């Protein structure tokens, strides 16, 4: 007898980036919530297109004094831009997380796939 069943696709990624929720609690919670709402955990680096995507992502979300607008997926990823999850968080949490993520991925070439995990 022959049995056939569809196998679940396993997402392809090149690197795993683990974000420590005890160091960046607001950013980590935003990403967790965005993932729970269907935003991708595997994203593709595209640094050249980031400037245009951040404008699209933040369009219509006004700045508030004492907060930064955090987006997931971030604009440095092809999946970012229009439709990204936006949350206002503390500037120190946002800027430290963005700086750390940018530094960790600085030598990684465009089109690399990164899987984000919150720990």
Per-region residue spans from a language model:
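Nuclease and nuclease-like effector domains acting on nucleic acids or nucleotide cofactors
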Residues: 1-69, 73-119
């Amino acid at each position: 007898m022959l049995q056939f069943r569809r196998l679940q696709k396993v997402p392809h990624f090149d690197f795993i980036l683990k974000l420590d929720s005890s160091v960046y609690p607001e950013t980590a919670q935003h990403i967790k919530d965005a993932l729970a709402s269907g935003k991708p955990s595997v994203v593709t680096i595209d640094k050249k297109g980031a400037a245009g995507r951040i404008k699209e992502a933040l369009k219509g979300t006004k700045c508030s004094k004492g907060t930064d607008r955090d987006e997931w997926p971030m604009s440095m990823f092809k999946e970012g831009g229009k439709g990204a999850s936006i949350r206002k968080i503390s500037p120190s949490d946002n800027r430290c997380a963005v700086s750390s993520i940018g530094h960790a991925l600085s030598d990684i070439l465009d089109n690399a796939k990164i899987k984000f995990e919150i720990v």
